[in-house]
């Protein structure tokens, strides 16, 4: 076999359907859009959720709840992510951001207890879960709420 003899596998390449090229093509005249009407026009069609003038579902269903403007969103860090630091390192939100562990500090950093901590660290964060707090102290490290 030579390079010029290479061919695509049978059925792997489908020929593009060219519409409006004569009635015998099967997609001539109206090009598969049916007769007149909104959907036959260029740019035609209805917006998402439109139900033909009937009150749409999202307006028939009552509103519920509200968004609390005072909610705090914390950047979450798990224990196993802290293993990138050397023993005895003081881990602060700024250091976590520099290391690429958190993208933005948001309302502060919360340390969660997923994974296993293998280093002795001093961790400074806004919040700690009970399991994270216990694991850090068990490794001889310390925590500080800031």
Curated annotation (Swiss-Prot):
Pfam families in the cross-refs: Ribosomal_L27A
Region (Disordered) residue spans: 1-51
GO terms for biological process, alphabetical: translation
GO cellular component, as recorded: cytosolic large ribosomal subunit
Disulphide bridges, residue numbers: none
PROSITE patterns in the cross-refs: RIBOSOMAL_L15 (PS00475)
GO MF term list: rRNA binding; structural constituent of ribosome
Feature: compositional bias, Basic and acidic residues: 1-13
Lipid biosynthesis as UniProt keyword: no
Biased composition (Gly residues): 23-35, 42-51
Keywords: Ribonucleoprotein, Ribosomal protein, RNA-binding, rRNA-binding
Top-level taxon of origin: Bacteria
Quaternary structure and partners: Part of the 50S ribosomal subunit.
Protein family according to the UniProt entry: Belongs to the universal ribosomal protein uL15 family.
Role noted for this protein: Binds to the 23S rRNA.
Name of the molecule in the record: Large ribosomal subunit protein uL15
Gene name in the database record: rplO
């Amino acid at each position: 076999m030579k390079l010029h003899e290479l061919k695509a596998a049978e059925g792997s390449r489908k020929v593009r359907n060219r519409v409006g090229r004569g009635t015998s093509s099967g997609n001539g005249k109206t090009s598969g859009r049916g007769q007149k009407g909104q959907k036959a026009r260029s740019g035609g069609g209805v917006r998402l959720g439109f139900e033909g003038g009937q009150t749409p579902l999202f307006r028939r269903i009552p509103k519920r709840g509200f968004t609390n403007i005072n909610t705090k969103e914390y950047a979450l860090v798990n224990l196993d992510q802290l293993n990138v630091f050397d023993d005895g390192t003081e881990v602060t939100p700024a250091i976590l951001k520099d290391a690429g562990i958190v993208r933005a500090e948001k309302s502060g950093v919360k340390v969660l207890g997923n994974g296993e901590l293998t280093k002795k660290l001093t961790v400074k964060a806004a919040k700690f879960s009970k399991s994270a707090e216990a694991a850090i102290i068990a490794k001889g490290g310390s925590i500080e709420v800031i």
